[in-house]
Amino acid sequence: MIRNVKKQRPVNLDLQTIRFPITAIASILHRVSGVITFIAVGILLWLLGTSLSSPEGFQQAADIMDGFIVKFIMWGILTALAYHVIVGIRHMLMDFGYLEETFEAGQRSAKISFVITVVLSLLAGVLVW
């Protein structure tokens, strides 16, 4: 016979006291960077279409890219893309069995992914500016 036992567990509703492990943060940021990259594709395709439409369109696209805010947004897009690719490779390596699926290995690979992303982000900053 199955009993329907309701356990009285404490409920913590204060979100500021919840600490996610680094693996959860890496996974959440991977999803966020995927959404950013998806939205950025439309913007970048519009910019490409404008630049290829005519010599005036190319000049218009070049003028758009000269602004600091646009360069900052482009740097953010490149950083999101780099993060998404690096963590995507990490997930694939784990799925194919090349990385251990232990919590410690997950933490270590997430930290390595963050470091690689910071390096690529700095390179993207040099490229954009």
Curated annotation (Swiss-Prot):
Source domain of life: Bacteria
Topology of this chain in the membrane: Multi-pass membrane protein
Ranges per topology, Periplasmic: 53-68
Gene3D superfamilies assigned: Fumarate reductase/succinate dehydrogenase, transmembrane subunit
Binding site for heme: 84
GO cellular component annotations of the record: plasma membrane
Keyword Lyase annotated: no
Database matches in PROSITE patterns: SDH_CYT_1 (PS01000), SDH_CYT_2 (PS01001)
Transmembrane segments: 27-52, 69-89, 109-129
InterPro entries: SQR/QFR_C/D, Succ_DH_cyt_bsu_CS, Succ_DH_cytb556, SuccDH_FuR_B_TM-su
Pathway assignment: Carbohydrate metabolism; tricarboxylic acid cycle
Keywords on record: Cell inner membrane, Cell membrane, Electron transport, Heme, Iron, Membrane, Metal-binding, Transmembrane, Transmembrane helix, Transport, Tricarboxylic acid cycle
GO molecular function terms attached to this record: electron transfer activity; metal ion binding
Subunit structure: Part of an enzyme complex containing four subunits: a flavoprotein, an iron-sulfur protein, plus two membrane-anchoring proteins, SdhC and SdhD. The complex can form homotrimers.
Function (record text): Membrane-anchoring subunit of succinate dehydrogenase (SDH).
Descriptive protein name: Succinate dehydrogenase cytochrome b556 subunit
Species of provenance: Salmonella typhimurium (strain LT2 / SGSC1412 / ATCC 700720)
